[in-house]
Amino acid sequence: MTVYVDDVRHKFGNMVMCHLWADTLDELLAMVDTIGVQRKWIQGHPTLSFGKHRHASWVHFDIALSKKALAIKAGAVLTDKYGPSEHTAKLGIASGDPARAERGQRMLDNIARCRAMFSEQPV
């Protein structure tokens, strides 16, 4: 099982944020405890999240770049900007729901096309 952090930069007030998620809730909560992020900031969980954060499409934390560095040092795997979409697609495929599995596979196919397209562009 793995904890992941993506390579994005989203401004939030004076902070720059990215996403942290994991294969299991226990791993995710252990990582935020390790890096000093309060559990109350979890998003997408039906009971642990609060308010509008409960309705996020996947269970994750938005973390500051300083916490990202700590997460990587603690063993989190760095992904590209497609990491969260890839994760949710795989959840859909594993769900046992044929419609979700089909959507998940289409999403993985689209991600593969995007990655290929961007890897072919000169820097």
Task: Report each predicted region and the residues it spans.
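Catalytic phosphate/metal-binding cores of nucleic-acid and nucleotide-processing enzymes, i.e., regions
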Residues: 1-122
